[in-house]
Amino acid sequence: YALWIIMGEALARKYKATGDKRYYVDPHVAMLGIDALGFRRGAGALATLLQENGLADHPLFAEAKIRGIRALAGHAESTDVTNDVNGGPSGIGIATAAGKAAFWDMVGASMEGPKVIAFEGEFAMTEGHAQELKTQALALQVGKRLRVMFSDNNAGIDDSLLGGVIASKYDHYSLVDQWTSYGWNVFTLDDGNDYDQVVAALKTMEDWDPKDRRPMVVVGKTVKGYWPCVSHGKISGQCDHVVGYPSHPYAMKMNSEYFVALAKTFEEQYGVEFVGIRQGAVTDTRERLIQFKANIDVAMSVLERNGLGDWLVERLVAIGDTVKDDAKLHFDVKHDPFQDDRLRVANLPVEPQKVTVKNRISGVEKQVSIALFRKPGEIAGTRRGISEIIKWMNYVTDSRFITLAADLSESINVEHGSLWGHYDPENNPLGTRIKAAIQEAGNVSTAIGLVSQSASVDPEKFAGVWALSGTYGAFTPLMYTPARVWSQQNQDSKFRMGVLHILAGHSGPETAADGRTHFGIFATQVWKLFPRGQTIHLNFWDYNDVAAGYFAAAEIAARDPKVGIISIEVARPDFPVADRAKFADTDLKAAAKGFYVIRDFAPGQPKHGYIVTQGSSSTVNLVSILPRLEQAGINVKVVAAISEELFDHQSEAYRNSVLPPEARYDLMVVSTGTRRMWPLRDVGPLTDAYSLTSDWDNQWLTGGLEPEVIAEAHLDKESVLKGIERFANDRTTRLNHQKSLLSAL
C-alpha cells in the first residue's frame, strides 16, 4: 500500500502543479495519502469517519473530498489495484499464478509479455494449495512467463520455520532443493534485501531463453523486520533491532519507543520531523486521526525534496508509455463468445448434431458428434451429459472452455469435451483438456487463474476463457476456500471476468462400492455457502436435464457479472432417460426453470401434499412408483428440484404455479443429499420429520454395491413408497399440529 500511495501522491502533486495531463491519474484508480486512514477499515465506517470526528472540513483531510477514503483490506485485494488476486488465506493468491500465466499462452501472447510475477514467503508456501503450484506450473509448461519471487526470511507470526516448526537437526530441509526437485528453474540470492541482487535476478529472468518451459523462482534470503538504518544490531543507537517473527507489527503499540526509534532514522535521512510521536500514544480518536494524517503528509513531503518526486513521475510516465494494448492474439478480443445466441436454452438443438470444427491454428477440420438430449428409454446417466455440454460450449466459443480434473477426466466425463485433445502450449495450444494431478485445491486454483484473466481492453467486456475443475463430490470441499476467495474477488472486480465451474462428479450415495469416504452427501453442500445470487448450483437427475439446466445457468452468468461460479452435481449410475410425455410439465427443457412439475394433483380428489425431489436414485425411484401411489389413492404433487437459483429467476406466477407459498407447510423432500440442507429455503417445521434423505438416521452410511447402499439410505423404491404413504396418511395430523403451534402464539 505504501508503494502505491507514494506513486499516486507523486503523480497527483505533479499534475496539480503543472496541469499536464501526462501526470493525471483518475483518483478513483489511484491510491493517495488520505487512503492510509483506510487501512484495515471498512468502506461503511470510512464514509462517515471524518464527519463523526468533526474533521470533514479540516484542511488536513481535504483530499477526502475528491472521492472519499479508500478501504484498504488487511490482506491486499484486487480492488486495491495492488494485486491481481485477493490475499488472506496463506498462499491462496500465488496458487492461481500458473493458471494466469497459462491463459496468456492459450491466447497466443508472446513470451515477452504479459508476464506474471508472484511474491510469496516460505511459511505461506507450506500451505497445501500453494505447494501444489509447483506441480501445476510445470505441468502447464508456463516457462519464463511465470516468475516467483520467494522471500525466505524464516519467520511467520508465531515461530520460525527452520529451527522452529522444523527442528534444526533436520538440516536437509532445503527450500531451494524443494523447488529444484519439482523441475523449476531456480535462482538464489544471498541477500534478498539488496536491490542490486534483486535487479540482477530480474534481468536474468527477462533475458532467459523463452524456449525453456520451466517456470522460474528466485529464492532470496531476507529479514523480517528489515530496516535500512541498522548499526551493530541497534536502531538509532539505542533500541535492539527486532527481527524474525517477533517483529510482526500486530503487537506494537502506538508511538512506542521502538516505533520512535525507527521514525528517527527516517527523520535523519530526509531532514523532516514527525509530529507528536514523542508524546506517547494518543487516546482521543479525533486527535489520533489528525496526528496520523499530519505524519503521512510529513512522509509524503519527501517527494518535494531533491527532485525525488519529479524523477519518480517521469519514470512512471515513461513506463506507462511502453504499455501497449495491441498485442496479436489468437482470437477476437472485442467479442464475448459466451454470449453467443447458440448458447441460449431456446436455441439448443434437441436432435443429435454432427458439426464441423476447424483448428484455427493448424487449419485441420474434423466432424464432432454432440447429443445434448436423448430419446426416452436410452440408457445414459447425468454424468454422460457433461461431456456433451462442454463439447457444445467449445464448438460455439472456438475452444474457450477449459477443464481440469483430479486424474478423473474420463471417469467424470469431461475428457471428451475437448475438441482438440490435451493442452500443450507448444504442440497443441488449442487443446482444452489440461492433464492434472490429484490436486483438487491446486486444480481449482489454476482454473481460477484462467478465468480471472481477460484480454479485453474494455473493463465492461470479457475476452477470455471459462474453466471447470472436477472431482468426486465428496472431495470438492478441498476446492472451497480458493473458490470462496475467488467469489469475493469477482463480486467487487472492476473488470468483467470469466466463470468458474465446479463439477461434483460421482456425487451422492450412488458412489457405492468406492465406499463412504467417496459419498458426496454432506460435502457437496459447501457449494451453497455463498451469498445468494453469486453462484448457481445445479443438481441433475435425468440426462435431459443437463443441457437445459446448465445452459440456463450459463446464459445468466454470461450476462450478470455477479455470478462467478456455477457448480454442478451429478451421480455415477446410468438410468433410462425419462419419458417426459408422462410428466405434468412435458417441456424437454424444463430444467432451465430450476423447478418443474413431474406430477400434478389429480383434479377432484383430496390433496395429500407436495413432494420436492432431488438427486438421481431418489428421483428415479420416486418416478417409478408413481403408478403405485395413484393406485393407492395418494394424490401428491411431485416437483423436481434442479436449481433453486434458476427457480428464483422465474416469474412469480411460474413459481407460485409450481410451489405456492403455502406449499412449504405441506411438503416433504426426497433427496440423496442431507436433511441438514434442503433443496429450497423456508420449508415448514415438519419437513424434517417426514422427508427421506441419505442421513435419515443421522449416521454415516457404510458401503457396498449400489442397490445395497441405496436401500441403506432408505431411498429404494419400497422405502420411498412407505415414506410417501406415511406423509400422505398423516396430512390432517401434520396440518393440525402446525395450526396449534400458530394458535399458541
Residue ranges with predicted function:
Residues 122:
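Active-site glycine-centered loops adjacent to acidic/histidine catalytic or metal-binding residues
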Residues 125-129, 476-479:
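Active-site-adjacent loop/helix micro-motif of nuclease/hydrolase catalytic cores
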